């Protein structure tokens, strides 16, 4: 446009602008913009729904997650008490909180005065009775139902009537946790994502008895924390982690079938994911998923299911925190390096399981991992766990690194056409069997009618 006359330049710029406007990337970004504003519309919750006072909080568990949640609440102006069962834990948590404030000052995000004000509202304790007067408690302890029930039972005895009891569980039943208290209506899931002070997503998980004003207050809290609160229903893993299991399942199977971890990761990263699944596993810690799977009783009858990750976790290869997981991390580096030992272990495991190894294309990696997400997302929508398909997109764009220009997994499926998606899923079922590739009825019906996931619930 700069090489022609002004009039011709305008004409050329308009031509290019229209190409951008009509592109799939533009559609995806516009969808993301409106989807993030739609999530606040929750059936039964409106401007008339009362909101409880939420000016003070307690956080149970002074690990990295708990300290990050405490810092987020302090930054939003709340008074915060951090509880842990050991002096060492509390000292570690305090140092994390102080370090986050100091980092904010160093980067020019906050002033010294703001840091001092924030820390003046911060206290630590090992005594549950010190939490008697807080407005909300956020539990962030180990992902074990027995441990969480013990914590909620203790809170139920000391926390004032009307306080909200929230759990940061990433997978466990809100209703089962709530049943350990005498006030299930006050219990809700607030699933923060790590690092809690940075990640924008907050999954707000309502139980069968969660009161409307508790949901409304949680949405208001999310906003005050600078997060996008997405209200979801109660099931294993809720929306995000339930879908992650399907995504991770396929990436794990691909390793046994012949794709190297770095090949899988690079393929999905190049497609647009913020990180590859194997790098994500090492970052989060392979022991986390391993322990969750050890507690589950409803895993598929398939010896290949997360076989590689569980094998590595069983060897103490947890990821970055141990210096080796799926990858090697030399001298404390966060940069993953392919490990020949892992390659040999995967080959031996595939041989033991009778899995024939072969060359796998980039297209197959993308298709199986992304369509695994879509199929699980369709089930979630069909079951009413998500209010609308765009809520699922918001979860995956803001919590799991799904490329924003693709608009989230459900929008991506709609953009392809659900008839084509259904056809592809049927092909995957023919090739790999029905265990993971049975099409949900919702997908079948929409494919036949020419509908979209976006139309569900309208």
Write out the residue ranges for each language-model feature:
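N-terminal glycine-rich phosphate-binding loop for ADP-containing cofactors
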Residues: 1-458
């Amino acid at each position: 446009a700069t090489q022609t006359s002004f009039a011709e330049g305008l004409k050329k710029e308009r031509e290019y602008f229209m190409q951008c406007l009509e592109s799939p990337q533009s559609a995806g970004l516009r969808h993301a913009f409106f989807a993030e504003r739609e999530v606040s519309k929750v059936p039964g919750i409106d401007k008339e729904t009362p909101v409880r006072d939420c000016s003070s909080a307690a956080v149970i568990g002074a690990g990295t997650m708990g300290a990050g949640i405490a810092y987020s609440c302090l930054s939003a102006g709340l008074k915060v008490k951090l509880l842990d069962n050991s002096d060492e834990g509390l000292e570690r948590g305090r140092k994390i909180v102080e370090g986050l404030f100091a980092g904010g000052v160093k980067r020019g995000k906050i002033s010294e005065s703001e840091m001092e004000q924030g820390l003046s509202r911060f206290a630590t304790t090992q005594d549950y009775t010190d939490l008697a007067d807080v407005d909300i408690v956020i539990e962030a302890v180990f992902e074990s139902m027995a441990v969480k029930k013990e914590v909620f039972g203790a809170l139920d005895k000391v926390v004032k009537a009307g306080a909200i009891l929230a759990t940061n569980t990433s997978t466990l039943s809100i209703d089962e946790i709530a049943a350990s208290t005498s006030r299930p209506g006050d219990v809700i899931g607030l699933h923060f994502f790590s690092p809690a002070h940075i990640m924008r997503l907050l999954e707000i998980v309502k139980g069968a008895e969660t009161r409307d004003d508790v949901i409304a207050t949680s949405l208001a809290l999310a906003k005050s924390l600078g997060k996008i609160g997405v209200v979801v229903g109660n099931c294993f893993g809720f929306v995000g982690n339930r879908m992650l299991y399907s995504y991770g399942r396929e990436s794990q199977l691909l390793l046994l079938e012949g794709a190297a971890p770095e090949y899988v990761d690079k393929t999905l990263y190049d497609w647009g994911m913020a990180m590859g699944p194997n790098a994500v596993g090492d970052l989060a810690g392979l022991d986390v998923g391993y322990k969750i799977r050890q507690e589950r009783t409803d895993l598929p009858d398939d010896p290949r299911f997360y076989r590689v990750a569980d094998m590595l976790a069983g060897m103490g290869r947890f990821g970055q925190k141990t210096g080796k997981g799926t990858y090697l991390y030399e001298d404390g580096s966060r940069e993953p390096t392919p490990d020949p030992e892992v390659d040999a272990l995967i080959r031996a495991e595939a041989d033991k399981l009778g899995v024939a190894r072969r060359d796998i294309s980039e297209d197959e990696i993308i298709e199986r991992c992304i369509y695994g997400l879509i199929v699980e997302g369709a089930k979630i929508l069909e079951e009413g766990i998500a209010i609308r398909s765009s809520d699922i997109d918001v979860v995956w764009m803001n919590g799991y690194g799904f490329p924003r220009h693709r608009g989230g997994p459900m929008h991506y499926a709609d953009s392809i056409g659900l008839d084509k998606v259904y056809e592809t899923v049927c092909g995957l079922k023919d090739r790999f069997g029905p265990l993971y590739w049975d099409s949900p009825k919702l997908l079948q019906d929409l494919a036949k009618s020419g509908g979209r996931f976006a139309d569900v619930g309208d």
